[in-house]
């Protein structure tokens, strides 16, 4: 078999007159009565191959048997297309290949999905036949971008003198965070490894070990409920460094991300990125990962509401809640009563009891709650919300967390429906000064907002024992267009501070020693100050490639039920394998 001389998408007019050897898949076959045209495809693109009896009867006879997705080896001569046959939409649209020989390397059945960017196959069918789905150019281009992003990050970190170090996949199960995936040990009866949710502890131990600068393209595993932007196994760019301040870490990540954007996406973004404190993000956007590509910020009306004539508002404030509103500029005529009812049902998903609304008209406020506001109150409301005729005002009165969640989500929905979002923008943002702990009323205990190894502000360390809810974290999240790209922090590196953190989280001294004794002991041997960040590679590629689902950025992903439709994993295992592990199954009976 002769060697391939050209990739299909790279045969240009410079090759006219040359004999070329091409290999690829049949994208399309057209029989035009005596002539057969084939679009031959490989990962670089498509080239048109012509089978003409005057050039080769033998090649034409073979071409008559060829169907879509056959794998071919074609030998032929490159010629310029006639003036009326030029296709400027193709890189190879000014030439075609006159076939002299063709060899079918492999035949193909009719494929269950159309191999084209605009395939109409359902996602389940695409995942079952993932190897066919991956043939689509849009999929290849996504993974080419993933490769380019990873390569750029590796090159950047190499110039910054970071070492790429692999950490264990089989490790110890520890509390906090999501559920672990467990792996039974054959050698140690009744004991289990856990697959890592992140390399957090190991990268800190590498800092104890004096490596100073570490990174890893790390596989991580979390047994959690899945969403469109979650997978049970995912990849993160894991970075840790000693002796750097928070500002130094943020500056380095900004330089890295601007290079990624330029090299992998061809987009210039400016640094430094804006910074916003967590409390401000929640107050202004109702989100800890705000999409800043459009306005429509939340406005706190609690002070006004406390003295207004609308009891729903006043009672919410009196009970310790708040009233906030968003002004959808010019949207009054775009939302009917039925549309607003749909918005009301939408905010109820986030815990809101309802959605109050007003439309601003030339002669004043109109809507079901307008009667509760006199002229003075109406003017204050209009002034505070900067409302003018044609605006739609939307209010939620509830607990602070419900107001933030519901209006934050409503803001995003309105931004999309009103086409306020410039999809060409890439708005990076740092969210800083997070709360260190969050209280869970159901569990009646505190949980770490990020993880238990996050350093509090020095002046807040003592609050861990007196008022844990007031302690602030030296933590930072990188946000892009309303998605959390990653999170990081400065780390605790002193045993006494780490023990105070564990105590605030409800760990007894014995539990802390059992779970994290190795880390606590390491802190007694001269641990340097250190910090880092972990960036979600899958999510970053999803945003840069313009995809809407993480599954499109992972070669062989899982479904929302954490199953693989291609291999049918997870699946039962043989009884002999269970016996070897000294395991017995005790399955719940289906109700």
From Swiss-Prot:
ATP binds at residues 222-224, 231, 484, 536-539. One of its GO terms (biological process) is aspartyl-tRNA aminoacylation. It comes from the Bacteria. L-aspartate binds at residues 176, 222, 450, 491. The keyword Metal-binding does not apply. It catalyses: tRNA(Asx) + L-aspartate + ATP = L-aspartyl-tRNA(Asx) + AMP + diphosphate. Its EC number is 6.1.1.23. InterPro entries: Aa-tRNA-synt_II, aa-tRNA-synth_II, aa-tRNA-synth_II/BPL/LPL, Asp-tRNA-ligase_1, Asp-tRNA-ligase_1_N, Asp/Asn-tRNA-synth_IIb, AspRS_core, GAD-like_sf. Residues 200-203 are annotated as: Aspartate. One of its GO terms (molecular function) is catalytic activity, acting on a protein. It is found in: Cytoplasm. Belongs to the class-II aminoacyl-tRNA synthetase family. Type 1 subfamily. This is Aspartate--tRNA(Asp/Asn) ligase.
